[in-house]
């Protein structure tokens, strides 16, 4: 190799370990010539330089490591070590790994439990195959054709007693952590060499020693010139349940929009119509048209164009669930899948299909979300980015999102237009050419909007910053979310501090300190979910209007609790767990957990409220009465008496009807009619909060090691400090691009710090530790209760509402003329009583008036420092900020609440509701304002059901359904009848999604379906319909349904303000009576 440069700076975005094979010959001890396949691992880094050119850095051979843990009391002394190393060496598969230098004793601290440093065996392998073969041979695992026992070690220790660490840690993660290099970010190299042969399609390719590569700090705020493109397809699909698999399916158009403002259009059309179509579209030289005679040529041309662009990322809208699925299905049918997948930069490594969960093997179903995993080119779904970032959008169609974020949208092209063009693909008349130009423009605009949305919201910057901070590949950050990021992050920290990170929990989960009960069903006959700890503290507000309300918040409560109390895998243990440290080294934390038991405050309050209605029932001679609210709109759909939940005992009274409120209660119950109504509603709320039959009644006690700092506190403290530094640096940066990078960086630090707590509580996660999760939650409850008590005791400030880490306090005359200063002083006083570094912060907003309706449900109006109030209201947890209500219902609710904040009377409130309801009945509300959206999950093929072992329920995709009594017979003979049965058991939105597929409509984007509620005559008919289909085929909107939708939410407002639950029903009663008369007349004359 020739040296060609002393080094450069590159932005790395994709690391890959390539497994290479080489056949070598050798002679055994008997002199026989034998052939050996040598497998090695080679590391590559795909980068771009400062000009945006793609670069591949080949860093030579790397090794993957494994740690072996022997039983706790097994000493690896010199007497045993020689025999142990010989046994381990014999179990190694690869010849090059059979050397003493590859097998070493090392001292590491165990991750779980308060234990001191122990001795482990570290073994390096030249291939992943060799590492897996070694593990199987030592532990005795094998396939069914091989009979193999575990290895035997001195003093009766067998291989199945050993535990392996780093067995699931990717090789590139091990290498990059050891070399202190980022998964994404700027790096600086030493001397670069020109390789003898090229392995990639990159613009430049070098060989470099990984020891001469380091992270670049001088270019941290320099925006990387990443070239990207977005793509979209148009296809004729006959069966949307399995797109692309039908013999008559066909992909006939693909568009590509590149970040350098150029576009490509690949389509099936008559030869020579490209230029004419560009003129019809009004496109210039920025658009290149590729005309293909058939579908195979189109797929091959798509592959050729993608490779010629030289982009580092390809993205689309909903490509994982539609475009990639269709392309792969068509390529498989046309026998060109290998060529299609050759979309990456590597010449010697073909692309592969991977699910978004990371599976690259086995058969993929049409319902699997997949992407094309290729070296050097990231495959991203922009819709998934928006779903994870903007979780409250009512729908995720490209048309809606682009209108909301870009202020523009695509031209409306109907399914009829698309099907007509497909039927006339090879025609060259004026009508076909005009239609082809319209559809082509529609397809190109789809790609342009997708690319613009990604650039507008800086999603690539968000992904790269999160990848850099958490040491996780960009693709993994995009698809696999929190647990995988925490696994990579914890591995990096463990490797840096000499901790043996456990990553295999399949054989003995007791080492994770979970202390779980038996899960085989023998100890849990009734299939109830066993609780291990209770949740955060919530103080419910008393519904009503409050003046002058301030808010306090525990800043990063769970992360700072981990720092304050040294909470970590290696410091928190059960009270009776063994430890290498003595008792004086521990801090004891004790508390009680009560969920669903007789000590649960919710249970106590529920029993008290039930006794009121039971006493009333006795006066009425044990007449069957209900506990539901007073109006008929709160009545249950069935009068069948059911227990409140599985925990309560049988009661003679579990209902309360309207008529009883007008009777005279017994003398011992001095409650008004309104109080009884509120008690009934409160009883219903408490019922909804019951634990679903699960019970927890326990005194908890854990020990926390004080003498050694844990990994999690250090990690969380680093992230919080780094975020403060980045936020401070943002104030001094004027460049918008650099400021955008810093903003995404500080957000990544915040999200990661808050994710640490959540990852410990995930029982089936990558690194579970419920001892940490439960003590953190308990200390959080203690902290917020202590803060409420301090505010009341020291400053006479009462707390109206508290939830997890926040407090809403009532400000009285003591706040004076400057309530902001008073709240800040209150926060500082509470902070002085808490353990450092915990801080209570005063929110900047003081509300002049707040309407509290319930838990996480309140509306406020801000107070400005000049004494004026905001014209806008802050909405929290009410229907105006939820996705499952129509715009009309939200508008009615918003107008009515605004009248409440304008100090209207109850009659004025009723008049506002009546006017809005009358507007609807007079058909002065557009269909678009009546449209609702709802989430739709996977329904599979609507015939195949599986048994969920956790709940022992039959599942149709993601929905629970009853099994048909003749399922097996119908599945093989009459699948249509079976499909009709199971679809009828689905919720209405899911049934509508199936109907759309049967009609040949495109797949639902973003998993949310848009529909109208319509009037039906047959109860078995579907009461909802997709809006475009409704406009084409007609129907009657069920306007009464929308009026009923406003009754419950506004009744809560009326109860909170005027203590009346009949206000709203009184306002809409004339409308309801009018509708009833109209329907009777329709029945009489029709």
UniProtKB/Swiss-Prot annotation:
Main EC class the enzyme belongs to: transferase
SUPFAM superfamilies according to UniProt: DNA/RNA polymerases (SSF56672), Ribonuclease H-like (SSF53098)
Spans annotated as Disordered: 638-657
Gene3D superfamilies: DNA polymerase family B, C-terminal domain, Helix hairpin bin, Palm domain of DNA polymerase, Ribonuclease H-like superfamily/Ribonuclease H
Catalytic activity: DNA(n) + a 2'-deoxyribonucleoside 5'-triphosphate = DNA(n+1) + diphosphate
The EC number(s) this enzyme carries: 2.7.7.7
InterPro entries according to UniProt: DNA-dir_DNA_pol_B, DNA-dir_DNA_pol_B_CS, DNA-dir_DNA_pol_B_exonuc, DNA-dir_DNA_pol_B_multi_dom, DNA/RNA_pol_sf, DNA_pol_B_thumb, DNA_pol_palm_dom_sf, DNA_pol_type-B
Keywords: DNA replication, DNA-binding, DNA-directed DNA polymerase, Nucleotidyltransferase, Transferase, Viral DNA replication
Residue ranges the record marks as coiled coil: none
Gene Ontology biological process: DNA-templated DNA replication; viral DNA genome replication
GO molecular function, one term: nucleotide binding
Signal sequence residues: none
Family: Belongs to the DNA polymerase type-B family.
Known function: Replicates the viral genome. Host DNA polymerases cannot substitute for the viral enzyme in this process.
Name of the protein this chain belongs to: DNA polymerase
Native organism: Heliothis virescens ascovirus 3e
């Amino acid at each position: 190799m020739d040296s060609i440069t002393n080094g450069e700076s590159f932005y790395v975005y994709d690391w890959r370990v390539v497994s290479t094979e080489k056949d070598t010959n050798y002679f055994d001890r008997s002199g026989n010539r034998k052939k050996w396949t040598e497998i090695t691992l080679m590391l590559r880094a795909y980068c771009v330089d400062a000009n945006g050119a793609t670069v591949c850095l080949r860093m030579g051979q790397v090794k993957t490591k494994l740690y072996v843990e022997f039983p706790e009391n097994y000493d690896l002394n010199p007497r045993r070590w020689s025999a142990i190393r010989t046994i381990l060496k014999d179990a190694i598969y690869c010849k090059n790994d059979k050397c003493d230098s590859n097998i070493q004793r090392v001292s590491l601290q165990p991750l779980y439990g308060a234990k001191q440093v122990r001795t482990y065996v570290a073994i390096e392998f030249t291939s992943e195959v060799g590492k897996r073969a070694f593990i199987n041979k030592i532990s005795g695992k094998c396939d069914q054709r091989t009979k193999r026992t575990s290895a035997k070690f001195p003093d009766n220790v067998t291989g199945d007693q050993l535990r392996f660490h780093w067995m699931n840690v990717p090789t590139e993660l091990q290498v990059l952590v050891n070399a202190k290099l980022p998964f994404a970010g700027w790096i600086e190299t030493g001397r670069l060499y020109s390789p003898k042969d090229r392995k990639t399609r990159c613009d430049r390719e070098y060989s470099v020693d990984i020891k001469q590569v380091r992270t670049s700090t001088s270019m941290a705020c320099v925006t990387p010139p990443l070239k990207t493109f977005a793509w979209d397809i148009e296809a004729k699909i006959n069966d949307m349940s399995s797109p692309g698999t039908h013999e008559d399916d066909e992909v006939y158009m693909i568009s590509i929009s590149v970040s350098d403002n150029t576009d490509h259009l690949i389509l099936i059309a008559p030869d020579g119509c490209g230029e004419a179509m560009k003129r019809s579209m009004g496109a210039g030289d920025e658009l290149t048209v590729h005309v293909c005679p058939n579908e195979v040529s189109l797929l091959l041309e798509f592959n050729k164009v993608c490779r010629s662009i030289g982009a580092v990322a390809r993205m689309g809208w909903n490509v994982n669930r539609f475009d990639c699925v269709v392309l792969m299905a068509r390529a498989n049918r046309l026998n060109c899948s290998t060529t299609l997948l050759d979309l990456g930069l590597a010449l010697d490594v073909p692309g592969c299909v991977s699910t978004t969960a990371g599976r690259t093997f086995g058969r993929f179903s049409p319902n699997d979300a997949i992407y094309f995993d290729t070296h050097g080119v990231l495959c991203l779904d922009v819709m998934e980015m928006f779903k994870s970032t903007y979780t409250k959008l009512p729908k995720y169609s490209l048309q809606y999102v682009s209108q909301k974020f870009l202020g523009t949208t695509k031209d409306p092209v109907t399914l009829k237009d698309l099907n007509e063009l497909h039927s006339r693909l090879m025609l060259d008349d004026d009508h076909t050419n005009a239609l082809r130009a319209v559809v082509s423009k529609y397809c190109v605009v789809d790609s342009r909007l997708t690319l613009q949305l990604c650039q507008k919201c800086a999603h690539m910057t968000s992904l790269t910053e999160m990848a850099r901070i958490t040491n996780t590949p960009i693709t993994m950050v995009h698809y696999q979310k929190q647990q995988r990021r925490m696994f990579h992050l914890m591995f990096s920290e463990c490797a840096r501090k000499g901790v043996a990170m456990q990553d295999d929990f399949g054989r003995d989960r007791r080492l994770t300190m979970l202390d779980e009960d038996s899960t085989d069903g023998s100890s849990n006959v009734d299939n109830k979910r066993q609780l291990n700890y209770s949740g955060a503290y919530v103080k419910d507000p008393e519904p009503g209007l409050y003046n002058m309300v301030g808010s306090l918040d525990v800043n990063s409560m769970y992360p700072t609790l981990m720092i304050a109390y040294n909470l970590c895998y290696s410091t928190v243990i059960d009270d009776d767990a063994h430890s290498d440290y003595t008792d004086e080294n521990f801090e004891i934390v004790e508390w009680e957990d009560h969920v669903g038991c007789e000590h649960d405050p919710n249970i106590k309050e529920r029993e008290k409220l039930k006794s009121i209605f039971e006493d009333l029932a006795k006066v009425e001679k044990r007449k069957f009465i209900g506990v539901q609210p007073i109006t008929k709109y709160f009545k249950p759909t069935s009068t069948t008496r059911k227990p409140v939940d599985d925990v309560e005992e049988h009661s003679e009274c579990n209902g309360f009807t309207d008529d009883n409120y007008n009777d005279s209660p017994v003398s011992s119950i001095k409650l008004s009619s309104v109080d009884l109504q509120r008690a009934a509603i409160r009883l219903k709320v408490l019922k909804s909060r019951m634990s679903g039959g699960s019970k927890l009644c326990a005194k908890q006690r854990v020990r926390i090691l004080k003498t050694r700092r844990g990994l999690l506190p250090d990690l969380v403290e680093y992230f919080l400090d780094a975020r403060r530094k980045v936020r401070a640096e943002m104030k001094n940066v004027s460049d918008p691009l650099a400021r955008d990078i810093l903003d995404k960086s500080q957000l990544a630090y915040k999200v990661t710090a808050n994710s640490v707590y959540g990852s410990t509580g995930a029982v089936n996660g990558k690194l579970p530790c419920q001892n940490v999760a439960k003590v953190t939650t308990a200390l959080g409850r203690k902290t917020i209760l202590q803060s409420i008590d301090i505010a009341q005791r020291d400053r006479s400030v009462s707390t109206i509402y508290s939830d997890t880490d926040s407090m809403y306090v009532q400000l009285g005359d003591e706040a004076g003329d400057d309530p902001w200063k008073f709240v800040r002083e209150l926060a500082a006083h509470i902070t002085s009583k808490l353990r450092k570094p915990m801080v209570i912060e005063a929110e900047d907003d003081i509300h002049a008036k707040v309407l509290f309706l319930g838990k996480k449900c309140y509306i406020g109006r801000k107070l400005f420092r000049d004494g004026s109030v905001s014209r806008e209201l802050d909405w929290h947890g009410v229907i105006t900020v939820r996705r499952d209500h129509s715009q009309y219902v939200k508008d009615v609710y918003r107008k009515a609440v605004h009248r409440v904040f304008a100090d209207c009377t109850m009659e004025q409130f009723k008049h506002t509701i009546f006017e809005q309801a009358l507007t609807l009945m007079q058909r002065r509300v557009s269909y678009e304002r009546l449209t609702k959206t709802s989430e739709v999950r996977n329904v599979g093929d609507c015939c195949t059901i599986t048994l969920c072992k956790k709940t022992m329920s039959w599942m149709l995709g993601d929905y629970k359904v009853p099994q048909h009594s003749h399922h097996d017979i119908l599945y093989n003979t009459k699948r249509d009848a079976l499909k009709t049965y199971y679809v009828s058991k689905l919720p209405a939105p899911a049934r509508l999604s199936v109907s759309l597929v049967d009609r040949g409509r495109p797949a639902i984007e973003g998993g949310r379906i848009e529909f109208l509620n319509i009037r039906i005559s047959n109860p078995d008919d579907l009461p909802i319909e997709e809006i475009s289909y409704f406009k084409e085929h007609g129907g009657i909107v069920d306007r009464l349904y929308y009026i009923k939708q406003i009754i419950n939410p506004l009744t809560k407002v009326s109860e909170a303000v005027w203590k009346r639950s009949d206000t709203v029903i009184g306002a809409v009663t004339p409308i309801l009576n009018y509708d009833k008369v109209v329907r009777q007349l329709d029945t009489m004359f029709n």
